[in-house]
Structures are given as structure tokens and as C-alpha cells.
């Protein structure tokens, strides 16, 4: 199933307690990040003291939802040394944290004994799983959703295992 950004925003707004996101790729080819990634490679960095220069709609959504008491957590399983893309992503993750997300990083070598799903996913209120399907170079292809309780339980357990071992963003240095 494909999904528009509006549909995804509505889905996030419908969450009552928690939304967790597990990311496991070392690179993404997301259209709306291509320009920023190129600028980052040329030395541009976001200024943490100038939110007007980096605030974006996703951060408004996170702030809106977390203000209602919803917990949004993101965990990233990454290879070390990190790829350029992960270094880029790390450089702006302070923006996610500023909006209310909690973010942790887990070096892949510390995840070898964990049973992780084959794709990145969001888990909403512990019930609905949305898998994000990417092609071999990291371009988003589509999403698959399921409310299967066994799949949701597997994803919840996988996320919590990564979260427990992960390093909070503020303490993970690249």
C-alpha cells in the first residue's frame, strides 16, 4: 500500500499512547533529504541556536502529538564506523529531540543476537505496524501495514530490545 504524507500525519495524530520507529539501514535515498545531504557533505551544519532555520513540518507534528502525552521513540541500528549518511542524520537529530522525540543509537555489532524484522517499521500504540519498504539504494518504495497481533508483538519486542541497549542521542558521539 502506498501512503501520502498527509495520511501518515493523520495516522500519527491518531496515536493515543506511543509511536516507536526502528530504523536499520546505513543509508537512505529519501527525496526530501537529497539536497540537505549534499549541503552537509559540503560542510553545512544546522545551527542549534537558530530553530527557524531548521524547523520543519515533521517537528510540528511531533510537538503536537507529544504535547498530548504520546511517547515518540526512535531507535537506529547502525554500522560502525558510520556511513556518511548516518553521520549526516546524527548531525540533525538534535532537531527531533528538540521537538519531543526520544532517540537512541545501537551499533550493529551489539544487535547480532537480536531477532529483528527485515524492514524498518513504525509501531503505533503497540497494535498497528507499518513497515517501510526501501529498494537496494535506500529509496522508499511503499509501506505495508498489519494489525496482526503476532507481528505487532514481534516488532514491539524487537524495538524494546534495541531501545534497552541503545545509547541516548545526547551521549552517542560520532
Regions found by a protein language model. Name each.
Residues 1-50, 54-174:
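PLD/PLD-like phosphodiesterase catalytic module centered on the HKD motif
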